[in-house]
């Protein structure tokens, strides 16, 4: 991917040798992967980057040529995800997730960020600093909201926010994020959405709204007008100077009130397999084109193979026109010994989506946003089984955009999976639509947009 030079005026105003980019990611794969891709591209384009991320990414950060700073891990993430999974009410589940995963860790991440910025200023006192954050890091929000500056700084660094997840800000045209309601555009529904937004702020989200204010105030934030009485999802995506929504507009609901700080820039393109790519033993059998390929993945976070991956293999076991590739999502992972693997299926512990999906006719997945976007950029229609975290919202967007079948459950039956796969294979509209959006995304040149924003805000400092 070659760098864009379509804004020479801005480019000429910035001395790149005097620019330091500090990238920030919360310690979860789905939030770190998109930032790591961007960090790698920035290094290739000649930028000096420090990356604050989970300890798990130390080696990968070094491999792409960036300086690494560890972010404190979640406190017992397994406990948190288990507790969240049993909360039936979507509003209450959203409230608990905001508190446990995002608001509570703010102080520790702020301390890590300030220490990193002060190190940068000591080592490179004359460099301009631009922050490249992502919506759920949150340790930068006190700084954005008027907290005292890190030592050595006389003004707040400019900040660009990467939003590599569904657009979840409050809107008159859609229900609150998490309620998984696809808007229908009617005046009656808009009135219903208005009431739902109000009820959530004073009801299920009241605790997280209050805690958000308390934590930010304790950490020195002073611009509380941007926080007072607001949904935390609105706050996290609008405190930086600009938010870059990492998808093409066609994947989101039609809204008349997109926040003025938000720019849709598309997703990064597929990544070519590295020269060191080692193909699994079944590779040539699968890619020879003699049968249609169905790729199945449970993702990397909510990994219970009995919920989707195993049922999908068995649902298609009698199809001699199909070969199934089941990606387990974790290096070294294996299915339990008692699980029978059908003769038309292959399993692999870990395999790049971008390596496998170009050969796929259907992608069956748990509707994680990262996997969903891999399906889009590779032009593969999907069967979406979203049941936890933000996955039902992602599946809704796939249905709305016309790129796949929404099973409306994270634990589909074999019959549901088979019907979804059959519908996609028999109806060309899904493939046609996903190819249209793939082309829309390619034309947006996401990485060039990220670089332009960096240069734009650096020039303003």
Swiss-Prot record:
Parts forming coiled coils: none
Pathway: Secondary metabolite biosynthesis
EC number: 2.4.1.-
Disulfide bridge map: none
InterPro entries named in the record: EryCIII-like_C, UDP_glucos_trans
Database matches in Gene3D superfamilies: Glycogen Phosphorylase B
Top EC group: transferase
Null allele phenotype: Impairs the production of detectable pyridovericin-N-O-(4-O-methyl-beta-D-glucopyranoside) (PMGP).
Single GO molecular function: hexosyltransferase activity
Stimuli inducing this protein: Expression is positively regulated by the cluster-specific transcription factor tenR and is induced during cocultures with the natural competitor fungus Metarhizium robertsii.
Domain of life: Eukaryota
Record's keyword terms, sorted: Glycosyltransferase, Transferase
Name of a matching Pfam family: EryCIII-like_C
Record-stated family: Belongs to the UDP-glycosyltransferase family.
Function: UDP-glucosyltransferase; part of the pathway that mediates the biosynthesis of tenellin-type 2-pyridones, iron-chelating compounds involved in iron stress tolerance, competition with the natural competitor fungus Metarhizium robertsii and insect hosts infection. Targets the N-OH hydroxyl residue of 15-hydroxytellenin (15-HT) to produce pyridovericin-N-O-(beta-D-glucopyranoside) which is further methylated by the methyltransferase MT1 to yield pyridovericin-N-O-(4-O-methyl-beta-D-glucopyranoside) (PMGP).
Protein name per the record: UDP-glucosyltransferase 1
Species of provenance: Beauveria bassiana (strain ARSEF 2860) (White muscardine disease fungus)
């Amino acid at each position: 991917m070659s760098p864009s030079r379509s804004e020479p005026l801005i480019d000429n105003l910035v001395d790149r040798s005097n620019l330091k980019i500090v990238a920030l990611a919360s310690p979860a794969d789905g939030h770190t992967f998109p930032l790591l891709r961007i960090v790698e591209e920035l290094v290739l384009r000649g930028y000096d980057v420090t990356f604050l991320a989970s300890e798990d990414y130390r080696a990968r950060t070094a491999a792409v040529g960036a300086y690494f700073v560890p972010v404190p891990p979640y406190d017992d993430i397994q406990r948190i995800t288990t507790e969240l999974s049993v909360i039936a009410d979507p509003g209450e589940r959203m409230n608990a997730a905001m508190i446990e995963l995002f608001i509570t860790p703010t102080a520790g991440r702020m301390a890590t960020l300030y220490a990193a910025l002060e190190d940068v200023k000591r080592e490179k006192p004359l460099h301009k600093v631009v922050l490249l954050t992502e919506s759920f890091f949150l340790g930068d929000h006190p700084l954005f909201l008027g907290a005292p500056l890190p030592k050595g700084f006389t003004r707040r660094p400019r900040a660009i926010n990467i939003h590599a997840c569904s657009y979840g800000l409050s809107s008159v045209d859609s229900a609150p994020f998490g309620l998984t309601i696809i808007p229908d555009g009617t005046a009656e529904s808009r009135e219903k959405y208005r009431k739902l937004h109000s009820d959530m702020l004073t009801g299920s989200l009241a605790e997280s709204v209050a805690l958000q204010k308390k934590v930010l105030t304790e950490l020195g934030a002073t611009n509380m007008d941007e926080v007072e009485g607001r949904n935390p999802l609105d706050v996290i995506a609008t405190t930086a100077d600009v938010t870059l929504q990492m998808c093409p507009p066609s994947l989101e609901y039609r809204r008349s009130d997109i926040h003025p700080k938000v720019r849709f820039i598309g997703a990064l393109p597929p990544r070519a397999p590295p020269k060191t790519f080692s193909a699994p033993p079944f590779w040539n059998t699968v890619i020879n084109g003699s049968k249609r390929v169905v790729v199945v993945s449970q993702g990397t976070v909510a990994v219970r193979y009995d919920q989707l991956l195993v049922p999908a293999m068995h649902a298609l076991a009698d199809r001699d026109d199909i070969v199934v590739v089941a990606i387990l999502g974790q290096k070294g992972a294996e299915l339990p010994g008692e699980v029978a693997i059908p003769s038309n299926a292959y399993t692999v512990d870990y395999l790049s989506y971008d390596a496998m999906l170009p050969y796929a006719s259907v992608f069956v997945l748990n509707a994680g946003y990262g996997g969903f976007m891999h399906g889009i950029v590779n032009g593969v229609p999907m069967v979406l089984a979203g049941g936890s975290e933000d996955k039902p919202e992602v599946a809704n967007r796939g249905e709305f955009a016309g790129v796949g079948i929404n099973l409306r459950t994270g634990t589909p039956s074999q019959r549901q999976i088979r019907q979804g796969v059959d519908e996609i294979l028999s109806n060309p509209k899904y493939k046609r639509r996903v190819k249209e959006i793939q082309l829309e995304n390619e034309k947006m040149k996401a990485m060039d947009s990220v670089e332009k924003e960096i240069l734009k805000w650096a020039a303003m400092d």
